[in-house]
């Protein structure tokens, strides 16, 4: 066995947790690598960012060396570059050392030929002859934007079923963000299609407090598991929001377990349900990867008392008016150059840190006002701030959290102007 060496501790790779659900013979690492948040570098010439391939290779090498074998990507991740980057990194390893998952992300074009081309491009980008886990990406919208329009009316589901039969897709499933009606409809097709897995957003906040049109994770999990379908978990940390939490909630978690990270609570919650096959984490930095390996080497399942403790924590978090942005960047690029996730992430950070001036009578007003405005300018260049939103709405259909993005940008911009004019 290869020893797993982590900063400040040492554990054996044999202790890591795997899941297996017959008749599927795959032995899948409970920690899966989400490839939506690969590290980036400033692009030559200063126009945006490019993926840091050298660092991606280092992260993938470390992950595989330490037992991670499930890698999840999509044609739309990192503005279209994730699949290629993931393929470059994985190609350097034996094919039997990893399972790769990708998706049909045909949000903007439901044409049959477009979907087939996207599928074949994924094989090419990933440099593989078959895809282990293939998903109908982000079901949940009604009508033409959902299952019916994107996969049934155009014959694409029939095409994918034939690809599964031919062995070029080993397991076929779908990921979900949306309405209960669309979820129930997709799941009801299991008897005729035989879904091999379903990917849902599951964390201790969304268990009973899903935002927007999304469905509570307790319902999603119970329904999928009742049909004996393995569950792949996405957003166990809500795009990092469950590690960037208000100070008193942070203290609440640390007091309960001083040795563990705040993130480890979320990963234990996501990994405890027995029908979970793997838990995806978009690990941009090595310390994220090492911390998550520590949590799942092996997983210590939550006790009933700990589970209730986290659900109570989620109740407390509902008092904080953050925008439910997970920094997925599906809304990007904005045609007017706005850094949409940058604006929303900064706003949420200030809410959680208490740097949200309420009025000039607040004793912390001056300090909080300065922290918000200076931090905003440092986080988001002026030409990319919310003030440039014209409300075109191009971003809205792409948001898996159903955020009314122009509305939130205009609200934040109005708040910023009030702070600048000191009219709160």
Where are the predicted features?
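Structured C-terminal cap/extension of enzyme domains
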Residues: 69, 194, 219-424
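Catalytic domains of carbohydrate-active enzymes, especially glycoside hydrolases
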Residues: 56-76
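Short catalytic-loop micro-motif centered on adjacent basic/acidic residues
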Residues: 70-77, 170-175, 278-280, 399
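N-terminal amphipathic alpha-helix/helix-capping segment at the start of soluble metabolic enzymes
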Residues: 14-34
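Glycine-rich, proline-tolerant flexible connector loops at the mouths of alpha/beta enzymes
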Residues: 42-45, 50, 70-89, 140-145
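Single conserved hydrophobic/aromatic residue that forms the stacking wall/gate
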Residues: 1-13
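Conserved, mostly hydrophobic/aromatic
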Residues: 21, 33, 63, 71, ...
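Glycine/proline-rich, positively charged
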Residues: 41-42, 109-232, 237, 245-250, ...
